[in-house]
Design a protein with these regions (language model features):
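Active-site and adjacent substrate-binding regions of carbohydrate-active enzymes
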Residues: 1-169
Length: 169
């Protein structure tokens, strides 16, 4: 819900929604298009069995299914922020005071950093994964492995942001 709220407040996204769907309403927005809450099929669209059926139809049309994976960040209200906060870049109250656009208090009170590209402002609907965390890498690998079971290929969006030298910035 937090990422959805941020998406609904974003004027650029609201304009894009209106251009694509002139009669859209806030209820049509499932979440932020930039912030992954879960790598599961949205229940509004079906379930994993429906995804398999869709993939079979795509194959019958002579094409393959490519799914997206984002190793750099997740939705700011992703369940891991509560169950595995050590998988994210953390801060403290002083960090929020110094850089309020970079840090936020997550559910449960942990202070976490928003996702970002080091050359641009933080994305305020996301949380930054700590790619140096062994637990984060293991959890991401499991998500990627599971996604790959349903796809003919996986596109890794923002993959350059998890390179050691880029991430260190």
């Amino acid at each position: 819900e937090a990422s959805k709220s941020r998406a609904l407040m974003n004027e650029g996204l609201r304009k894009a929604y209106t251009e694509a769907l002139p009669d859209w309403s806030p209820e049509d927005v499932a979440g932020s298009p930039y912030a992954v809450y879960s790598y599961r099929v949205d229940p509004h669209l079906g379930d994993e069995e429906d995804l398999v059926q869709a993939r079979n139809m795509i194959h019958e049309a002579g094409m393959g299914l490519i799914l997206d994976f984002v190793p750099n960040h997740l939705a700011m209200d992703h369940p891991w922020t509560v169950s595995m906060p050590e998988c994210f870049i953390r801060g403290d109250r002083e960090a929020i005071r110094r850089e309020p656009s970079l840090f936020f208090p997550a559910e449960g009170g942990t202070i976490l950093a928003h996702g970002r590209d080091p050359y641009f402002p933080p994305w305020n609907d996301t949380v930054q994964i700590n790619i140096f965390s062994d637990r984060a890498r293991a959890a991401l690998f499991e998500e990627l492995r599971r996604i790959a079971e349903y796809a003919d290929g996986v596109r890794c969006d923002m993959a350059m942001l998890v390179l050691n030298d880029t991430f260190a910035r």
